[in-house]
């Protein structure tokens, strides 16, 4: 999916409750504010969103100035990933592979294999939240993070030239 506000699975604005069991996702999301699975914005007083992924295979790519491959931006989100195989790559100024660079929440990863990579600005992270980390049990995490303070999303560079 692509656009100014691009989200493949979830809610553009507000609460989301996503449950995936035994599911295979292949998602490519590009935009100004983008996500693969989750929510892009909160409503005032909204309930924390929930994402529960189990027994699933995910192959996710996110390219946006801000967003999250799995998670919510600008809103609280509680995420549980179990017995799953996830490959995720993100690029942007304030992006997260799994979790949120701009929101709050909790993240539990158990019995899973996660391969995460990113080329991003200083306000980005591979796995977790800016305000706290996550809990990982009996899982393999392979993370490759290139954090560059001068990173600019490629489309912005093309517009400037």
Residues of each region from the PLM?
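Surface-exposed loop/turn motifs in large extracellular/passenger domains
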Residues: 1-30, 37-63, 67-94, 98-119, ...
């Amino acid at each position: 999916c692509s656009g100014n506000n691009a989200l493949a699975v979830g809610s553009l604005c507000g609460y989301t409750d996503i449950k995936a069991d035994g599911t295979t996702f292949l998602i490519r999301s590009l935009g100004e504010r983008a996500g693969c699975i989750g929510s892009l914005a909160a409503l005032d007083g909204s309930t924390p969103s929930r994402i529960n992924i189990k027994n699933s295979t995910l192959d996710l790519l996110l390219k946006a100035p801000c967003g999250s491959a799995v998670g919510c931006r600008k809103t609280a989100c509680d995420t549980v990933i179990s017995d799953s195989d996830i490959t995720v790559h993100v690029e942007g100024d304030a992006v997260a592979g799994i979790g949120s660079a701009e929101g709050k929440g909790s993240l539990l990863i158990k019995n899973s294999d996660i391969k995460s990579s990113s080329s991003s600005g200083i306000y980005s992270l591979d796995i977790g939240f800016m305000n706290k980390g996550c809990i990982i049990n009996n899982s393999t995490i392979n993370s490759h993070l290139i954090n560059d303070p001068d990173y600019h999303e490629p489309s912005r560079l093309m517009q400037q030239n």
